[in-house]
Amino acid sequence: MPRYIFITGGVVSSLGKGLASAAIGALLQARGYKVRLRKLDPYLNVDPGTMSPYQHGECYVTDDGAEADLDLGHYERFTGVPASQADNITTGRIYSRIIERERRGDYLGATVQVIPHVTDQIKQFVLSDAGDVDFVLCEIGGTVGDIEGLPFFEAIRQLGQELGEGNAVFLHVTLLPFIKVAGEMKTKPTQHSVKELRSIGIQPDILLCRCEIPIPPGDKRKIGLFCNVKESAVIEGRDAASLYDVPLEYHSQGLDTEILRCFGIDDAPAPDLSRWQGISETIANPDGEVTIGVVGKYVGLLDAYKSLIEALAHGGIANGVKVKLKWLDSEQFEKDDPFEPLEDVHGVLVPGGFGERGVEGKIAAARFARERKVPFFGICYGMQMAVLEAARNLAGVTDAVSTEFSDTGESVIGLLTEWTRGNEVETRKVGDDMGGTMRLGAYPAVLKDGSKVREIYGQAHIEERHRHRYEVNVGYKDRLEACGLTFSGLSPDGVLPEIVEIEDHPWFIGVQFHPELKSRPFEPHPLFASFIAAALHQSRMV
């Protein structure tokens, strides 16, 4: 049976519980253990698929089509363990299941209540489908004291009791603010956070204290005394220079050792952290720098592009260079000269998005890259905008539009109404529910012989993750190819365009999928590695 680690947070949100969970998973892996990571989100949405990126940040997509919290991206990048539908649960999903069962009569006339029915569903989620692993790490979203989080805290309290001593560890991430005017660190927020946690029946075993400066020994003793934990279990969590330094920093503070001690494991293998040390060294000592202009809609909250940012960093790691990102609001491009802000970049990337806002700015960015021979990477919506640009300015389809934002003109981009998943055909129509109705998850594609993407991937058949409900109309394929836009990747049935490229260009590729979701620091996605290599070449030409 696996052992369970429950990660909670207090004082404020955004303390890095997701990163802490991912780093702990990586440290346990470095000792030879198998891990699984899960996220429990207390919000009432069934999933984050219909939430604004400004509200929630990125919506992460798994191979099996789950629209999930961005923390699952951290989990995958740090551990390499693919996440699934079974690794993210929300209050909305739990209540939906319970109400469905109640309507069927499954509760045999009982009064359906938060305890035991909601808490039992949460416990079932935590314990089910764990697989053959040594540790399951469960992160509870939000902070202790949140009303919506109470059923989750009660469920893990019960699990701690039911699993028994030595099978469950509670780790609480908290804040130790440093008051500059007073010149001292304050422990009261942490004490009150732990007091709140203990009031609902959970005694933390370990405190991961986020702070700006080292914790004085006296404060460590004080925290341990008032929070009822060992002094060695008060772990310092200072900001790291790089995301990928976090496992090394936490190991240096003894976090993984303390976790194993709490489980009664004193004969664990020593960790092999050589891979993490190598990544840290590469990031700290880059051999050059490239600037990538990212023309997006949600640049006001960079968490909306979390996986993209990391995938570009992985491309930099693959080439031994630092990747500097220049964020450009696509809507601003519609008001000002779109070319001027891009003059100093070595590559242009247009990421995914939805809706009409900023469309013409993205199209202008694609035109700049095509005409100036600057490396261009269009992802999902970005590929569609590159196709519209080519249709308008190369193929003469001057009124080319997407039905996503216009009903007039030639629909070069249209609603995706039918596609194949395995041996089944999925269909959608106008008016269907918005949530969970896109083309989601991993789908195969076939690459054209002799194409740039075929060379980049080094194989003819690939599988990538999708999240879209609009698609390039394959009926325009011949007309666009005659003008130089090659359809170099198609679905196996040849119906859905997956990749386009321009042969007479140093590097111009658009993909309908999201390659950033499968990039890892130790295995940079080949498209991002190649894109940064092209940008590096461009930087040495100017």
From Swiss-Prot:
Catalyzes the ATP-dependent amination of UTP to CTP with either L-glutamine or ammonia as the source of nitrogen. Regulates intracellular CTP levels through interactions with the four ribonucleotide triphosphates. Belongs to the CTP synthase family. One of its GO terms (biological process) is 'de novo' CTP biosynthetic process. One of its GO terms (molecular function) is ATP binding. PANTHER family: CTP SYNTHASE, CTP SYNTHASE-RELATED. This is CTP synthase. InterPro entries: Class_I_gatase-like (IPR029062), CTP_synthase (IPR004468), CTP_synthase_N (IPR017456), GATASE (IPR017926), GATase1_CTP_Synthase (IPR033828), P-loop_NTPase (IPR027417). It is an enzyme of class 6 (ligase). Allosterically activated by GTP, when glutamine is the substrate; GTP has no effect on the reaction when ammonia is the substrate. The allosteric effector GTP functions by stabilizing the protein conformation that binds the tetrahedral intermediate(s) formed during glutamine hydrolysis. Inhibited by the product CTP, via allosteric rather than competitive inhibition. The gene is pyrG. Gene3D superfamilies: 3.40.50.880, P-loop containing nucleotide triphosphate hydrolases. Residues 1-265 are annotated as: Amidoligase domain. Homotetramer. L-glutamine binds at residues 54, 353, 381-384, 404, 469. ATP binds at residues 14-19, 71, 238-240. Mg(2+) binds at residues 71, 139. GO terms for cellular component: cytosol.
